């Protein structure tokens, strides 16, 4: 760099890249015979960030897991529901394959495959959606359909769902457009009859109408902060056609609708198939036979059902499945409490009889896997309260009587350190 002197008394330093003097910039960083200013450093960072953004999609394309890999990952965290896992694995794989290869393939437009999960409370609907998002490393948000209303009414706008998704990825629109949205309690926004409503139904059919475009694909204008309260803010444009929507609900009573259709279709008179009570299909078997007409009778509008072409049904969890859930998944409940006790230096053992008792209680409460934590928490509350103040506890043992509230956990004490030292 050519030296430039000022008044012949000292050097005036210049940035080797943009030519600005040390007085025109905030900072000038010196290297071997060269200088760079803070403005040029910022510019270099911007260039590198743009390069990374361009490279990222190519990395993602090669990293898309196959349906088998998705299913295997779900097996690590979700017990049972084999058919639902297979349906989800294929639907999710096809959705992200569509995103990474464009919406068309050889001139054929690829449709959007949103998913409807039907199953009782605590059967694993939410966990399946969360696990998928974690595997694919995409933003994930949950919404409760019962809190949603049409725009202009008291309650949450459907656009707030997209705002929550943006919050999860620091308002990065590109990331949000690859995200997963799970809308729970979707059965609660069914209309009261399968005939069009005469009066305004702002939290039922009205919400279904409001969700239609969002789920199918539209460019939603979402303010970065707040919904209706800050209309003056600059809106973010989010293309929802690239977002995977998974809707879930218990659909209590849907089995009766299906049963009526199946029995009506089996014939009447001399040609009718006579079934004994023992031949009646279980709720899970009936739900597996669900058709769009059943969902319409239940109260979903035809247009809304059309936006959810992939339907997966989940069975009510058996007692054996609940015991597996307690001990087998990577983040099993017993493993979580054992990790908590390990932080206090205490080993925690759950005997098989205790696991049986927990599962029986959950079955009696009809809460599925969701009720397991509250049962274990209640049984261990006093111990977790006292343990940090206790010394020399080495192990805790949980048996059936602890779960039934008849006794406290058996605590096994070790020798105090002073005694151990003197005994040696």
Curated annotation (Swiss-Prot):
Q: Name one GO biological process term.
A: cell division
Q: Pfam families, from UniProt?
A: AAA_2, ClpB_D2-small, zf-C4_ClpX
Disulfide bridges in this chain: none
Which residues participate in ATP binding? 120-127
Under InterPro entries, the record lists:
AAA+_ATPase, ATP-dep_Clp_protease_ClpX, ATPase_AAA_core, Clp_ATPase_C, Clp_protease_ATP-bd_su_ClpX, ClpX_bact, P-loop_NTPase, Znf_CppX_C4
- The residues listed in the UniProt record as binding Zn(2+), with positions renumbered to this chain, are 15, 18, 37, 40
A GO term for molecular function: ATP hydrolysis activity
Please provide one cellular component term from the Gene Ontology annotations of this protein. HslUV protease complex
Q: Which keywords belong to this entry?
A: ATP-binding, Chaperone, Metal-binding, Nucleotide-binding, Zinc
| Highest rank taxon of the organism | Bacteria
Identify the residues that the record assigns to the ClpX-type ZB domain, covering every copy.
2-56
The record's comment on protein family reads:
Belongs to the ClpX chaperone family.
Classification via PANTHER family: ATP-DEPENDENT CLP PROTEASE ATP-BINDING SUBUNIT CLPX-LIKE, MITOCHONDRIAL, ATP-DEPENDENT CLP PROTEASE ATP-BINDING SUBUNIT CLPX-LIKE, MITOCHONDRIAL-RELATED
Q: What does this protein do?
A: ATP-dependent specificity component of the Clp protease. It directs the protease to specific substrates. Can perform chaperone functions in the absence of ClpP.
Q: How does it assemble?
A: Component of the ClpX-ClpP complex. Forms a hexameric ring that, in the presence of ATP, binds to fourteen ClpP subunits assembled into a disk-like structure with a central cavity, resembling the structure of eukaryotic proteasomes.
Q: What is this protein called?
A: ATP-dependent Clp protease ATP-binding subunit ClpX
Source organism of the structure: Shigella boydii serotype 4 (strain Sb227)
Q: What is the lineage of its organism?
A: Bacteria, Pseudomonadati, Pseudomonadota, Gammaproteobacteria, Enterobacterales
């Amino acid at each position: 760099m050519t030296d430039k002197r000022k008044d012949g008394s000292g050097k005036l330093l210049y940035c080797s890249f943009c030519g600005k003097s040390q007085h025109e910039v905030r900072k000038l960083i010196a290297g071997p015979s060269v200088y760079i200013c803070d403005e040029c450093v910022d510019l270099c960072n911007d260039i590198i960030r743009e390069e990374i953004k361009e490279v990222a999609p190519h990395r993602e394309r090669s990293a898309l897991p196959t349906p088998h890999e998705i299913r295997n990952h779900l097996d690590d965290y979700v017990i049972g529901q084999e058919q639902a896992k297979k349906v989800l694995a294929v639907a999710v794989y096809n959705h992200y394959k569509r995103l990474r290869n464009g919406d068309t393939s050889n001139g054929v437009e690829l449709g959007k495959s949103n998913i409807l999960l039907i199953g009782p409370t605590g059967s694993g609907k939410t966990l399946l959606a969360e696990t998928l998002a974690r595997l694919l490393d995409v933003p994930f948000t949950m919404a409760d359909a019962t809190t949603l209303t049409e725009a202009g009414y008291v309650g949450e706008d459907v656009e707030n769902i997209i705002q929550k998704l943006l919050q999860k990825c620091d308002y990065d629109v590109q990331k949000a457009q690859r995200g997963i949205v799970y809308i729970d309690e979707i059965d609660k926004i069914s209309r009261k009859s399968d005939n069009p409503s005469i009066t305004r139904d702002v939290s039922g059919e009205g919400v279904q109408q409001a969700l239609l475009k969002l789920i199918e694909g539209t460019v939603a204008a979402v303010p970065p902060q707040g919904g209706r309260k800050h209309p003056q803010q600059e809106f973010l444009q989010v293309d929802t056609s690239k977002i995977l929507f998974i809707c879930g609900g218990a659909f209590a009573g849907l089995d009766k609708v299906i049963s009526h259709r199946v029995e009506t279709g089996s014939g009447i008179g001399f040609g009718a198939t006579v079934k004994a009570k023992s031949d009646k299909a279980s709720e899970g078997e009936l739900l597996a036979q669900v058709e769009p007409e059943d969902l319409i009778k239940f109260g979903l509008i035809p247009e809304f059902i059309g936006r959810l072409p992939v339907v997966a049904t989940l069975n009510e969890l058996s007692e054996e499945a609940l015991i597996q859930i307690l001990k087998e998944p990577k983040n099993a409940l017993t493993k979580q409490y054992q990790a908590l006790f390990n932080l206090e230096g205490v080993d925690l053992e759950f005997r098989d009889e205790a696991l049986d008792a927990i599962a029986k209680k959950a079955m009696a409460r009809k809460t599925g896997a969701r009720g397991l934590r509250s049962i274990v928490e209640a049984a261990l509350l006093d111990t977790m309260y006292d343990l940090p103040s206790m010394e020399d506890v080495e192990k805790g043992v949980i048996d059936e009587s602890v779960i039934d509230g008849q006794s406290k956990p058996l605590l096994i004490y070790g020798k105090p350190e002073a005694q151990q030292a003197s005994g040696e």
